[in-house]
Amino acid sequence: MEYSSLTLDDFLSRFQLLRPQINRETLNHRQAAVLIPIVRRPQPGLLLTQRSIHLRKHAGQVAFPGGAVDDTDTSVIAAALREAEEEVAIPPSSVEVIGVLPPVDSVTGYQVTPVVGIIPPDLPYHASEDEVSAVFEMPLAQALHLGRYHPLDIYRRGDSHRVWLSWYEHYFVWGMTAGIIRELALQIGVKP
């Protein structure tokens, strides 16, 4: 498949046909979730944020909207939708959730569940000034091109940990965000 011409219908068909196996073992027990917002267009986009430089953790990094599951959340999906509304003003009612990817462990001790959702193209995004410094859209076909990601092995506390690095325009996409995008690409059958 030529991913430069990936349509929303192609993406949805491939995601639904190749359902994720979510029984993956994780080390962390604290729950968090992120929303992977796919912008509904003939050539879909991937909505990303750049975190505020004033945050204590992951300052200035490119990320999906998301955060810890709290006591008011009924599920990880509810947490992802709540965080997306808090961070970039995406109303939960405007998100068509199509599924989740397997949870991943974060270096900060969370088990993070990526929630994949389709959002309308005309939403007036409004970044929460406390948490987000920028909101931008990357063409989904470009985001899912595995050749754009480069591995880097980091050693932490005696263990090797592989992270992925990439650039989009002037944004440095790496770490968990790049790993989740790669997982989404692999999930729909993109070959390395």
From Swiss-Prot:
Sequence ranges assigned to domain Nudix hydrolase in this UniProt record: 29-160
InterPro entries the record matches: CoAse, NUDIX_hydrolase-like_dom_sf, NUDIX_hydrolase_dom, NUDIX_hydrolase_NudL_CS, Nudix_NudL
Disulfide bond entries: none
GO biological processes: nucleoside diphosphate metabolic process
Signal peptide: none
EC number: 3.6.1.-
Organism of this sequence: Escherichia fergusonii (strain ATCC 35469 / DSM 13698 / CCUG 18766 / IAM 14443 / JCM 21226 / LMG 7866 / NBRC 102419 / NCTC 12128 / CDC 0568-73)
Enzyme's top EC category: hydrolase
Protein name, per record: Uncharacterized Nudix hydrolase NudL
GO molecular function annotation: coenzyme A diphosphatase activity; magnesium ion binding; manganese ion binding
Alphabetical list of Pfam families matching this protein: NUDIX
UniProt-annotated binding residues for Mg(2+): 83, 87
Cofactor(s) the protein needs: Mn(2+); Mg(2+)
Keywords associated with the record: Hydrolase, Magnesium, Manganese, Metal-binding
Source domain of life: Bacteria
Motif (Nudix box): 67-89
Job description of the protein: Probably mediates the hydrolysis of some nucleoside diphosphate derivatives.
Gene3D superfamilies: Nucleoside Triphosphate Pyrophosphohydrolase
Family membership noted in the UniProt record: Belongs to the Nudix hydrolase family. PCD1 subfamily.
